[in-house]
């Protein structure tokens, strides 16, 4: 059986006893200001050094090199952070389940995180148009907006959450909507 503390301990011994949150940030292909996006998120995260910050690699879209370079530089000077190149599916879901929150702009914040009742701080416009749940807190690119959404997510009471991507006949419903 998977144990997230054992997994974190394998990554870094300090992680097994600490609270943590996950960072999943990908390039915004519509907007070209990925450098400012990652800079503002990382600047905002400096206020949360009492948490372990677990970063994942960005996807391979144009602009991912900028994001990855900034994350690696951040990690060099922030000993409470770790970068994981690739999670296994089960490991990712277990880590997400016990994470204080997920921050970034990943679709995982709209699909898996609500299902696991993990709050999401969604930064920017990459996920614009997706249905929101009670556990998703949008933030603009501004540091003040990001910090405000982090504070809200840390005070989020895990409870029953509306799940937008589950239910009976989901495939038929999606197909019906796509046909219209």
Regions found by a protein language model. Name each.
Residues 1-180:
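Nucleotide-activated sugar donor-binding and catalytic core shared by glycosyltransferases
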């Amino acid at each position: 059986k998977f144990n997230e503390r054992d997994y974190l301990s394998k990554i870094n011994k300090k992680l097994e006893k600490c609270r943590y949150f996950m960072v999943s940030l990908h390039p915004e292909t519509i907007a070209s200001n990925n450098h400012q996006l990652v800079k503002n998120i990382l600047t905002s995260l400096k206020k949360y050094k009492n948490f372990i910050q677990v970063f994942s690699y960005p996807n391979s879209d144009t602009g991912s090199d900028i994001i990855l370079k900034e994350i690696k530089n951040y990690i060099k000077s922030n000993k409470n952070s770790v970068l994981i190149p690739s999670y296994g599916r089960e490991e990712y879901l277990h880590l997400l389940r016990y994470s204080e929150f997920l921050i970034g702009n990943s679709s995982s914040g709209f699909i898996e995180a609500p299902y696991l009742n993990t709050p999401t701080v969604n930064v920017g416009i990459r996920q614009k148009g997706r249905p929101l749940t009670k556990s998703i807190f949008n933030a603009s690119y501004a540091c003040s907006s990001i910090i405000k959404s982090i504070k809200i997510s840390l005070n989020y009471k895990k409870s029953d959450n509306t799940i937008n991507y589950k239910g009976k006949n989901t495939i038929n419903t999606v197909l019906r909507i796509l046909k219209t």
